[in-house]
């Protein structure tokens, strides 16, 4: 009996210890709980603190505020993201990635009181440009440290090198981190246990050291400013699985010609935008584990390297932005190949026969090359294809039915080719982008396109598509870009096309045969940025509901039959940069309120070819704040920015330098005012001279009068000035000769007088710039100004001038001659009367008087 009691007692003690030990993880030390709560209170929780949160595979996950669950009533070991030692209860790991934290991370943070930490992940938060504290180097037991993408800035402290137990160090960020160049090599020297090192976008600005940990499996140094020749030892790290050296334009990479020590382990190799020294060696054939290879923008030239075709386990091969040439060889049987990009190699040519038998291919990009011929119609091995890009080649023929039958197709881009025939019905229900613009396609828009639940881009412009726009288009509730411009569509615009779509950003129905009114209601909260309806037969008024388009940057309603007064309320669209109402039936004076902010962001204002009357809208012209600044940027031309310009270029008619042309992209510096072909009257406001960024000014074919404002001399970058066919009087301001960028000048058919300015650009303008101004003189006209040399042609001499002995007869000479002639004449009279010949004398006297009088009149005109 005693033995039984003893057994039960021992069992009780054992169970008590077991329960006690299992409860230890919940016994968080009070000082550590307090430190965590103090750390929590240093930050706010902002759901927008970080938008992109990747998981370990790179896929986006949802961020959530882990610290909101922290409170005193529970043990810190149960808090979200906190992990404790099962024996001691000490906090040994803190996972706060993607926790929506926002605020300054102070160097004396209570976090540094958690001295037993082994793992610390603060990635994907927003610490608003905080410095990385040297105290991170005091976590002597730390094996994992992730501070990436949390908006840290400044120099990474050298104390990080004290963390000799680190296996994982991730500090990559685009916010402005750097390592002092001479600290990079010592940092690596002490971190001998590293398995993963990620310093992407950290400014290293140094050569690549060779003392990387021999245990490295991941080395990510993209965008770090590395330069010089990459040490070959990097390729011989025997455990290396992932090597990313991309976006180091001063880095030279020479691949080993013999078998690499990492050949069996290397799975990912990214060398995008580095310099590859030689051709791809045969040693690439030994990379039997390689799954992903990115060699875009590496100046590869010649035929596609054969060793790349031997990578039998490759899943993703990216050779875009190179100078590869010749036909694409027949693809081997890549059983695992899912992604292939040869985008923008320019000189890759030949047909597409190589496409067969790649059953796993999901994404194929052959855009921007010189491929020719039709797409083969007998391809049957691409049933897994999700994305197909063949744009900007020389492909022709009809689009084969197998493309429309792809069951999982998500994105299709066949634009900028010469495909013909009809667009067939799509089998896929998962389409998100269909781009078939700039081909020769005809027929109607297939119903299957209008019933997609995820379609975001539908770009069918510049084809020969006909018929009506079905109201079924309103089912596309996820649509962002809709471009049906430059087709033969007719009928009315469905009223619901905007009303039901809260995501629509670009609406382009220009250059069709659409009629009726714009009866769409633009609801409050819409995000439309571009509305282009020009070149149709639309009537009625400009919808007042457009005032709800707060993000609108371009509004082009030109070349229609709209009958309305000027929609002054459009001035409240403060994002508006381009406004074209040209060639309509708009009329009446342009009235404006006293609000000085109206139209302040406009860069292009085109109201030409309407029936506007009254004075020029001086107050609106004075509000054009953007035009009051000169774009002094240099280098590559910058265009009016648009977040979707990679997919879509708006087409709008621009009048500049005396010509109308359709522009698909508009320079950010291109500032234009075109008020021509209206009935404006009165004087030209001198306030236009304040618009110093103006490049083109056209006020022609109105009823303007008065003088050309001298303030125009301030328009120092003006390239085109057209004031023709008005009633402008006075002289051309001499100060206009200082406009050194002026290429086109038209002042014809006015009432200008005086001398034409001389010098610089004015010496290059011809007669047509000034014709129809009878009072103008000077070059290039035949009427010259005083002091200018005159060139007289024989055709300009009349009969009297030919009889002159000298073209320069002075008044003194005439008087002397007349006096002498008088004395002689009196003597002759005496003789004639004496000899009885009065008739002869009378005839001679009359002739002499006529000759002298004529010469005197001619010289009086000349002087």
Curated annotation (Swiss-Prot):
Subcellular locations according to the entry: Cell membrane
Pfam families: LRR_1 (PF00560), LRR_8 (PF13855), LRRNT_2 (PF08263)
GO aspect biological process, one term: defense response to fungus
Predominant localisation class: membrane
Extracellular side stretches: 22-812
Cytoplasmic face residues: 834-863
Keyword Protein biosynthesis: no
Sequence ranges of the LRR repeats: 91-114, 115-138, 140-163, 164-190, 191-213, 214-237, 240-262, 264-286, 287-311, 312-336, 337-357, 358-382, 383-406, 408-428, 429-452, 454-476, 477-500, 502-524, 525-549, 551-572, 573-597, 599-623, 667-690, 691-714, 715-739, 741-759
Its biological purpose: Involved in plant defense. Confers resistance to the fungal pathogen C.fulvum through recognition of the AVR9 elicitor protein.
The family this protein is said to belong to: Belongs to the RLP family.
Domain notes: The extracellular leucine-rich repeats are required for the specificity of the elicitor protein recognition.
Protein name in the entry: Receptor-like protein 9DC1
Organism: Solanum pimpinellifolium (Currant tomato)
């Amino acid at each position: 009996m005693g033995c039984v009691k003893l057994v039960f007692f021992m069992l009780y003690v054992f169970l008590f210890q077991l329960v006690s030990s299992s409860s230890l993880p919940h016994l968080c030390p009070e000082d550590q709980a307090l430190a965590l709560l103090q750390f929590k209170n240093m930050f706010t929780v902002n759901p927008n603190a970080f938008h992109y949160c990747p998981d370990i595979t790179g896929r986006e996950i949802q961020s959530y505020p882990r610290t909101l669950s922290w409170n005193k009533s529970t043990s810190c070991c149960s808090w979200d993201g906190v992990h404790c030692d099962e024996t001691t209860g000490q906090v040994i790991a803190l996972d706060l990635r993607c926790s929506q934290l926002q605020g300054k991370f102070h160097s004396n943070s209570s976090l540094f009181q958690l001295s037993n930490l082994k793992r610390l992940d603060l990635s994907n938060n927003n610490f608003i440009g905080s410095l990385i504290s040297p105290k991170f180097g005091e976590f002597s037991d730390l094996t994992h440290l992730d501070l990436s993408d949390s908006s840290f800035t400044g120099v990474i402290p050298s104390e990080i090198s004290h963390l000799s137990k680190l296996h994982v160090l991730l500090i990559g960020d685009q916010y402005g981190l750097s390592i002092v160049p001479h600290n990079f090599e010592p940092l690596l020297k002490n971190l001998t246990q590293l398995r993963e090192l990620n310093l992407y976008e950290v400014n290293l600005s140094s050569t690549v050291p060779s003392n990387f940990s021999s245990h490295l499996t991941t080395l990510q140094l993209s965008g770090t400013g590395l330069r010089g020749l990459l040490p070959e030892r990097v390729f011989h790290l025997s455990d290396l699985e992932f090597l990313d050296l991309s976006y180091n334009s001063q880095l030279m990479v020479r691949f080993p010609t013999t078998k690499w020590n990492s050949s069996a382990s290397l799975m990912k190799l990214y060398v995008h935008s580095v310099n590859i020294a030689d051709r791809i060696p045969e040693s690439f054939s030994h990379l039997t584990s390689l799954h992903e290879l990115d060699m875009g923008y590496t100046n590869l030239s010649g035929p596609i390297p054969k060793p790349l075709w031997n990578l039998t386990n490759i899943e993703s091969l990216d050779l875009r932005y190179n100078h590869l040439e010749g036909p694409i060889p027949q693809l081997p049987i890549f059983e695992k190949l899912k992604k292939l990009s040869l985008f923008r190699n320019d000189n890759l040519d030949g047909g597409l026969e190589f496409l067969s038998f790649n059953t796993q291919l999901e994404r194929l990009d052959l855009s921007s090359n010189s491929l020719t011929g039709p797409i083969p119609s007998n391809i049957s091995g691409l049933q897994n294809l999700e994305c197909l890009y063949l744009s900007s080649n020389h492909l022709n023929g009809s689009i084969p039915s197998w493309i429309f039958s792809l069951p999982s197709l998500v994105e299709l881009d066949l634009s900028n080719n010469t495909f013909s025939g009809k667009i067939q019905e799509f089998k896929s229900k998962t389409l998100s982008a269909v781009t078939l613009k700039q081909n020769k396609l005809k027929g109607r828009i297939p119903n299957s396109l209008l019933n997609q639940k995820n379609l975001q881009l539908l770009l069918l412009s510049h084809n020969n598509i006909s018929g009506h726009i079905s109201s079924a288009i309103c089912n596309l509730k996820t649509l962002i870009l809709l471009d049906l411009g430059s087709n033969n569509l007719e009928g009315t615009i469905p009223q619901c096309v905007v009303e039901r779509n809260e995501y629509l950003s670009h609406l382009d129905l220009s250059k069709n045969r659409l009629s009726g009114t714009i009866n769409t209601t633009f609801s409050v909260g819409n995000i439309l940025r571009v509305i282009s309806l020009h070149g149709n037969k639309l009537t009625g008024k400009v919808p007042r509901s457009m005032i709800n388009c707060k993000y609108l940057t371009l509004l082009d309603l030109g070349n229609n039959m709209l009958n309305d007064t000027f929609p002054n309320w459009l001035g409240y669209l403060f994002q508006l940069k381009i406004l074209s109402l040209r060639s309509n039936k708009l009329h009446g004076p342009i009235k404006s309120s006293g609000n000085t902010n109206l139209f302040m962001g406009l860069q292009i204002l085109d109201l030409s070819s309407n029936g506007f009357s009254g004075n020029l809208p001086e107050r609106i012209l004075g509000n054009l704040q953007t035009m009051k600044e000169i774009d002094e940027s240099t280098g590559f031309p910058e265009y009016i920015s648009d977040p979707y310009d990679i997919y879509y270029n708006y087409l709008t008619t621009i009048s500049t330098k005396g010509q109308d042309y359709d522009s698909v992209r508009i320079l950010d510096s291109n500032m234009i005012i075109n008020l021509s072909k209206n009935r404006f009257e009165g004087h030209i406001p001198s306030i236009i001279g304040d618009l110093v960024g103006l490049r083109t000014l056209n006020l022609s074919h109105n009823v303007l009068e008065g003088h050309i404002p001298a303030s125009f001399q301030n328009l120092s970058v003006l390239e085109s000035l057209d004031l023709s066919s008005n009633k402008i009087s006075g002289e051309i301001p001499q100060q206009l000769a200082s406009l050194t960028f002026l290429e086109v000048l038209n002042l014809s058919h006015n009432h200008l007088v005086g001398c034409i300015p001389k010098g610089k650009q004015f010496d290059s303008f011809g007669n047509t710039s000034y014709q129809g101004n009878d009072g103008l003189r000077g070059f290039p006209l035949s009427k010259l100004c005083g002091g200018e040399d005159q060139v007289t042609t024989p055709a300009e001499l009349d009969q009297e001038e030919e009889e002159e002995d000298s073209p320069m007869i002075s008044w003194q000479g005439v008087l002397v001659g007349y006096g002498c002639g008088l004395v002689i004449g009196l003597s002759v009279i005496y003789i004639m009367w004496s000899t009885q010949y009065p008739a002869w004398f009378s005839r001679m006297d009359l002739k002499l008087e006529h000759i002298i009088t004529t010469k005197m009149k001619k010289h009086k005109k000349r002087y």
